Amino acid sequence: MQVEAHLQKIIDQDGKVHLTLIDPASQTPERAAEIALAAVEGGTDAIMIGGSTGASGTLLDETVIKIKEKVNVPTILFPGSSAGLSSYADAVFFMSLLNSRDLGYVITNQVLGAPLVYKSQIEPISMAYLVVEPGGTVGWVGDAKLIPRKKPDIAAVYALAGKYLGMHYTYLEAGSGADAPIPPEMIGAVKKVLGENKLIVGGGVRDAKTAKLCASAGADMIVTGTIVEEVKDVAAKVAEIVSAIKS
């Protein structure tokens, strides 16, 4: 399965993609698989696996394996560092945190992780990762110089730089469990310069109204993370959001 081509096909057919993010550190592999299955029943298009505190090793591998046993949608690694790689996944967001002050998150982790990606034949999907205020845990761990919420032009030039460096995707991140999502004005400004390149938006997307606002502003893909770990009926919550962004 070529994951990037698969996601493009969904965009061509449905207009938008929904991604569910599962952090292996937040629950057992078995529970992660149950959440993934419920999300797929709700209409999610792919499962992202990872977290900013860097789940790795056996826990990560077992989580990926259990999820793949339950669902047939793509599994995409979302690593917090080079340790967040698993040869069992279908693809990896091979990303650079462009607004980090720490070179480790800009390039060093990528250098360390590249050989494993090469040897295991995981599909790399190049991505510029941009952390916006408030930033949450990822902003702190990644030592990001947070992009101000009221400065969409700064986000746009970062995204443009990522595009010119050859990255296919740009991810605007407000931080896991953020009180507010990425502002629509920022999403629109970034999508304008990206053109055909794909824009992912995540952080603070907790309901259908917010998801639709982000999608209408220009996001090609919407990520739902924290909320699927909190609600009792994951399938219903995901279905509500998927319906909003694809209608």
Swiss-Prot record:
Record InterPro entries: GGGP/HepGP_synthase_sf, GGGP_HepGP_synthase, GGGP_synth, IGPS_HisA/HisF
E.C. number: 2.5.1.41
Protein origin, superkingdom: Archaea
Keywords on record: Cytoplasm, Lipid biosynthesis, Lipid metabolism, Magnesium, Metal-binding, Phospholipid biosynthesis, Phospholipid metabolism, Transferase
Pathway this chain belongs to: Membrane lipid metabolism; glycerophospholipid metabolism
A GO term from the CC aspect: cytoplasm
Cofactor(s) needed for function: Mg(2+)
Residues involved in sn-glycerol 1-phosphate binding: 171-177, 203-204, 225-226
Gene3D superfamilies membership: FMN-linked oxidoreductases (3.20.20.390)
UniProt keyword annotation of S-adenosyl-L-methionine present: no
Cross-referenced SUPFAM superfamilies: FMN-linked oxidoreductases (SSF51395)
Record flagged with keyword Nucleotidyltransferase: no
Localization per record: Cytoplasm
A GO biological-process term: glycerophospholipid biosynthetic process
GO molecular function: imidazoleglycerol-phosphate synthase activity; magnesium ion binding; phosphoglycerol geranylgeranyltransferase activity
Catalytic activity: sn-glycerol 1-phosphate + (2E,6E,10E)-geranylgeranyl diphosphate = sn-3-O-(geranylgeranyl)glycerol 1-phosphate + diphosphate
Binding site for Mg(2+): 23, 52
Function: Prenyltransferase that catalyzes the transfer of the geranylgeranyl moiety of geranylgeranyl diphosphate (GGPP) to the C3 hydroxyl of sn-glycerol-1-phosphate (G1P). This reaction is the first ether-bond-formation step in the biosynthesis of archaeal membrane lipids.
Family to which this protein belongs: Belongs to the GGGP/HepGP synthase family. Group II subfamily.
Name this protein carries in UniProt: Geranylgeranylglyceryl phosphate synthase
Organism: Methanosarcina acetivorans (strain ATCC 35395 / DSM 2834 / JCM 12185 / C2A)
Lineage of producing organism: Archaea, Methanobacteriati, Methanobacteriota, Stenosarchaea group, Methanomicrobia
